Regions:
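Conserved N-terminal substructure of TIR/SEFIR domains
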Residues: 1-93
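Cross-kingdom TIR/SEFIR domain
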Residues: 16, 58-62, 70-73, 79-183
Length: 184
């Protein structure tokens, strides 16, 4: 099921990139700004790494779209790696795969904040895939999303602004047009 959805997602992303004037794989790298990657993949590893995201990554690579995905798991309490932030900055677009546990990861939320920052600052193209979640639950932060933010607020009582920034980022990306898979 997710292989079929990954392929469909790839085709839609490829068409969207072309619609935005991105002629992959070569000409976008020859533009005034040097892009290292066509696509940065943001996803919650425990939800999709060994399934949907792997299939999507392979489908992108097979057709010449250079994609970045982080293959390492971040230990609890670690900060987001500078190399990850650099990969976001060096990407022409980002695909954010929102899954049930995405908001439970402060790392994913930090990534998302940076992705949306570069969307505003440098025109990064952002595409959202709702994988196994209802887009309305993401937008209104219900269910697992409400639970995740409650935990963040409890763990970071001194940093309410950061948690609110993450909430705002998740709401913003949920309001972008995207693709929905109800695969659960």
């Amino acid at each position: 099921m997710y292989l079929k959805f990954a392929w469909l997602s790839f085709r839609i992303v490829a068409m969207a990139l072309e619609a935005h004037g991105v002629d992959y794989p070569s000409s976008s790298f020859g533009s005034a700004r040097r892009w290292k990657y066509h696509v940065f993949l943001s996803f919650r590893g425990e939800d999709t790494r060994r399934s949907f995201t792997d299939h999507l990554f392979c489908a992108l690579q097979r057709t010449g779209i250079k994609a970045f995905r982080d293959d390492e798991e971040l230990e609890r309490g670690e900060v987001i790696k500078p190399s990850l932030l650099q990969a976001i900055e060096e990407s022409l677009s980002a695909i954010v795969v929102i899954s049930p546990n995405y908001a439970s990861s402060t790392w994913c939320l930090e990534e998302l904040s940076k992705i949306l920052h570069f969307k505003k600052e440098s025109g990064l193209h952002v595409f959202t895939i709702f994988y196994g979640v209802d887009p309305s639950d993401v937008r209104h932060q219900r269910g697992s999303f409400a639970e995740a933010f409650k935990k963040h607020e409890d763990k970071l009582p001194q940093d309410k602004t950061k948690v609110q920034d993450w909430r705002d980022a998740l709401e913003e990306v949920a309001n972008l047009s995207g693709w929905h898979s109800d695969y659960r």
